[in-house]
């Protein structure tokens, strides 16, 4: 019997609704960790002020990003690199904790062993190093694909979408999980492509919303936006987990 997308969406929404409080708490907790870590690792306000030294908006409006970086001093480039690295690392840690905690929570609930959010994160600890490498590699490849030409990035996002579920469910390494995910993804494109595309569009919408709050320095606003982004990712992970369980049974 073929797997129906409508069944997957219904199962996803049922689980999301039944475990909403725990999922919301996990999304906000990982968002808070990500924001605090990014703030702790980022350059201080005085260092960030050096990025605007000697630059004028009128002069840089026509420049590409590469030209803008080339116009910076060595100190400004160092500050920019540190800020970018801090944001990337903080986001990566948040995504790893979210994926590990949520996938562990789903597995425990499916086995009729409900756990708290902190307990789920604790149980996922042995999986976190593997997920860290996996999510780093997949994020890097997808981002490169989106930067070069959008289509390859989307295809890579679809190809590697099942990898976190495979890594945690089958106890496989990052490369093997990515390889197995690719073969399954393109064999089940009709079930994966719409979900991944919706996830990409929803994350882009949250990013656009975040740009409207660039003048708002409130930690609460930043955490809430990150939490919303995490909820979107949580929906996709629930969908992917259910799909993979059905594929294993087929």
Curated annotation (Swiss-Prot):
- Residues making up the signal peptide according to the UniProt record: none
Keyword Cell membrane carried by entry: yes
Cell compartment(s), UniProt = Cell inner membrane
Q: Which UniProt keywords apply?
A: Cell inner membrane, Cell membrane, Membrane, Transmembrane, Transmembrane helix
In the bilayer, the protein is annotated as: Multi-pass membrane protein
What domain of life does the native source organism fall in? Bacteria
The entry's cellular-component GO terms read: plasma membrane
Chain ranges passing through the membrane: 20-40, 86-106, 121-141, 146-166, 191-211, 219-239
Which NCBIfam families does the UniProt entry name for this protein?
Answer: PRK02868.1 (NF002774)
The family annotation for this protein states: Belongs to the UPF0259 family.
**Would you tell me the protein name for this molecule?**
UPF0259 membrane protein SG1383
Q: What is the lineage of its organism?
A: Bacteria, Pseudomonadati, Pseudomonadota, Gammaproteobacteria, Enterobacterales
């Amino acid at each position: 019997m073929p797997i129906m997308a409508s069944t997957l969406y219904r199962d996803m929404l049922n689980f999301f609704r039944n475990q909403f409080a725990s999922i919301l708490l996990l999304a906000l907790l990982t968002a808070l960790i990500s924001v605090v870590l990014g703030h702790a690792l980022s350059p201080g306000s005085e260092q960030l002020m050096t990025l605007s030294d000697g630059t004028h908006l009128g002069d840089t409006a026509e420049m590409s990003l590469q030209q803008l970086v080339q116009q910076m001093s060595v100190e400004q480039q160092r500050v920019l690199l540190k800020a970018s690295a801090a944001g990337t690392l903080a986001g990566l840690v948040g995504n790893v904790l979210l994926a590990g905690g949520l996938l562990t929570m789903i597995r425990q609930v499916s086995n009729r062993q409900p756990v708290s959010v902190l307990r789920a994160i604790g149980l996922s600890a042995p999986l976190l190093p593997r997920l860290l490498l996996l999510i780093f590699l997949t994020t890097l490849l997808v981002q490169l694909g989106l930067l070069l030409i959008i289509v390859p990035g989307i295809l890579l996002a679809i190809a590697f979408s099942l990898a976190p579920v495979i890594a945690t469910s089958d106890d496989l390494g990052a490369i093997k999980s990515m390889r197995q995910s690719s073969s399954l993804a393109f064999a089940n494109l009709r079930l994966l492509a719409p979900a991944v595309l919706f996830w990409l569009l929803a994350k882009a919408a949250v990013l656009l919303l975040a740009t409207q709050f660039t003048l708002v320095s409130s930690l609460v606003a930043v955490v809430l936006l990150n939490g919303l982004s995490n909820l979107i990712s949580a929906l996709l992970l629930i969908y992917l987990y259910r799909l993979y369980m059905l594929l294993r049974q087929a």
